[in-house]
Amino acid sequence: MSWERARQLASPIRFQVFVREQRVPAEIELDDMDAPSLHAIAFENEKAIGTGRLLPDGHIGRMAILKEWRRRGVGAAILKTLIDAAERRGDREIALSAQLHAVAFYRTHGFKPVGDVYEEAGIPHQAMVRALA
């Protein structure tokens, strides 16, 4: 999904999760990597409930699920969609920056930690990678 269409659906979710819940500064939540990225959005009864993006360089990011839909498979479905898209376009590896509370989730999907924990937007993160077939 292009950013032009995805923006209307993904922006409210990202604002709720990152800006309101996690106190990420609003001015850094949207960036110049949104337009060239592939966006995946999950729906329930035509309402957008989760989102994520795949950057041209193979990084997955901006994974955000509305609170009431967490731990119900929405994040896994979005992640699978993005991984499948990376495989279809021929990526050999994908990477992401996981917030520490989400490292176990990404491990279950084949991602491995690399390097040390670092801080981004005031939140501890762990770089992770996964090889693709």
Predicted regions and their residues:
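Conserved GNAT acetyl-CoA-binding A-motif
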Residues: 84-99
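A short beta-loop-alpha structural element at the N-terminal edge
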Residues: 1-10
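Conserved catalytic-core motifs of GNAT/GCN5-like acyltransferases
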Residues: 97, 112-127
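Conserved active-site tyrosine of GNAT-family acetyltransferases
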Residues: 14, 106, 111
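Conserved acetyl-CoA pyrophosphate-binding loop and the N-cap/start of the following alpha-helix
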Residues: 69, 73-81
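Active-site rim helix/loop that mediates acceptor-substrate recognition in acyltransferases
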Residues: 12-45
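Conserved beta-strand in the GNAT
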Residues: 41, 46-64
